């Protein structure tokens, strides 16, 4: 049986980490694409030379021509400019929109049947634009945001409660920006909701609020520490979890930026919501009930995404 083919558009920090994880998890053969000739080839060779030590069989190729992604089962897009200290994700919109246009054309021509995961920021607007540029069916393209944001929240909670991260579940919905919505009511430790843990004296409401705020600012915290780039280990791990659910038809319920057609009262936007990812891509959008306060936060987040999408239309008339 032929191995699956995973194409990685962008061979920077996230792209290289994705390539390594895809091999370690034996998800398939990997093609690294980057416009910086030599970088994808070098990283691919380096990882291939680690395979005998780690004990996995996967072919690695590097390329600077989109023809190399032909027939890919999964395409993960990280191409674009990362954040620097003092920048918001939204500051990247002009330059990364141009990148999405080129990437979309490459996917449309060479990998029109792939399941596509977009990581490029500002995420919710870039995945929207990439769908338009690529012509992909909306169920075959998603944005990586909620898995990462939820993982950050889970890490902070596990540290606070001194329990395994495996026993902490968390839901972060909405746009991948400062208005994201960590849903405390739907987040649990071993099935016990966080509000109950506050009542039990495990933590205080103030500490919980601080963790929610730290989650919202989680990406910026790392940008400010690194000074020369943005997070890459956790974003790569998050995208690999999504790719694995598709390739293995695991049907995991994961918060992702998905195309909505009336769910949550939204039509025609990619917004972070819980979805089921299986062999057909987005198999189902899970609609959870919001309290009035949660709905207000979610609506604010959606308004931010709408603003970014309108900005994209203003920059590129083809999207209007």
From Swiss-Prot:
Substrate binds at residues 83, 89, 121, 152. GO terms for molecular function: L-lactate dehydrogenase activity; L-malate dehydrogenase (NAD+) activity. Keywords: NAD, Oxidoreductase, Tricarboxylic acid cycle. NAD(+) binds at residues 10-15, 34, 96, 119-121. It comes from the Bacteria. It catalyses: (S)-malate + NAD(+) = oxaloacetate + NADH + H(+). The keyword NAD applies. It holds the Pfam family Ldh_1_N. Catalyzes the reversible oxidation of malate to oxaloacetate. This is Malate dehydrogenase. It comes from Methylobacterium sp. (strain 4-46). The lineage of its organism: Bacteria, Pseudomonadati, Pseudomonadota, Alphaproteobacteria, Hyphomicrobiales.
